Amino acid sequence: MTMYALELSFSDDPARLEGRPAHRERLAALRDEGKLLAAGPYADESGALLLYRVDTRAEAEAIVADDPYYSGPGVSVVSLKEWLPVTLAAELG
C-alpha cells in the first residue's frame, strides 16, 4: 500500500459548509475501509490535510474525483502527492 497526502485550500465562501456533512460521512466510510488514515482542517481554517493509504495513485485520484466536496464552492485541491513516511505511529501504520 502507498500513502498519499491530499492538501486542500479553503476560501471564505460559506457555500463550502453545505457539502461538509456528506463529505465527512464519506471520510468515515473510507476510514472504516482502512483507506483514510487521518483528515482534518488546519487550525487557521485556510485548508485541510488528508492522508490516504491505497494501492495506486489512480485509486487516490478516484477517491478525490468521487467526492463532490473537492470540486465544490470554496474548496481547491492544492496537491495530491505520494508520501514516504520515515517514521509512523503504530495506529497510523
Regions found by a protein language model. Give the residues of each.
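Conserved, structured core segments of small domains
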Residues: 1-93
